């Protein structure tokens, strides 16, 4: 299982804790606002908004919160003016890191993100310094208990247009192209597989093995970035031993 997938699986399991802290709803609300702002308030004609609403519903976000976020996005009701910013940099061991934020104050957020990088032995870089290392992919996690036959799952996923199926322990992840993401997700749901998380994300084209003190520093860096209120998503190309990753979960 790739370093990306192991980390993605741990983040997925930590989502419940994020929800309890209230951060998940804040992230989802900001994503809906931004999606509606740039593509309009109709999910039928705005794929990004449709995906954001689906994620919000899966997280049991109240309907009124979703509707309010859409209205704020299209400017129908007043609210804070948010904008998207992507930061790029390096962590310990030369790990490439991308951080997507939604903020109402770019200067404040940039200073805080830079401080987090520096605190944990990393450095914030210029725009484009690591973006080339990542590519967009669809990521679909399936509840292991809903998989009766792993070979059949692999066949179903590949037939639907998936690029890869990664099974490890209690984790099952389907990787797709962005274009085939929705089709594969729909087919798997129709066949009875229980999807626990699905999104278009960024996957590294190559990974950097990291161990020992550097591995712990990288994980602390990633955790603090993800705990920041303005951070929506983080991506990194590390490959860290399972025992160190599991100590985080």
Curated annotation (Swiss-Prot):
Any one of the GO CC terms: cytosol
Pfam families: TACO1_YebC_N, Transcrip_reg
Keywords: Cytoplasm, DNA-binding, Transcription, Transcription regulation
Disulphide linkage map: none
SUPFAM superfamilies named in the record: YebC-like
GO MF, one example: DNA binding
Localization, UniProt: Cytoplasm
Source organism superkingdom: Bacteria
GO BP field: regulation of DNA-templated transcription
UniProt xrefs under InterPro entries: Integrase-like_N (IPR017856), TACO1_YebC-like_2nd/3rd_dom (IPR048300), TACO1_YebC_N (IPR049083), Transcrip_reg_TACO1-like (IPR002876), Transcrip_reg_TACO1-like_dom3 (IPR026564), YebC-like (IPR029072)
HAMAP family: Transcrip_reg_TACO1
Family indicated by similarity: Belongs to the TACO1 family.
Protein's name according to its UniProt entry: Probable transcriptional regulatory protein DICTH_1505
Species of the source: Dictyoglomus thermophilum (strain ATCC 35947 / DSM 3960 / H-6-12)
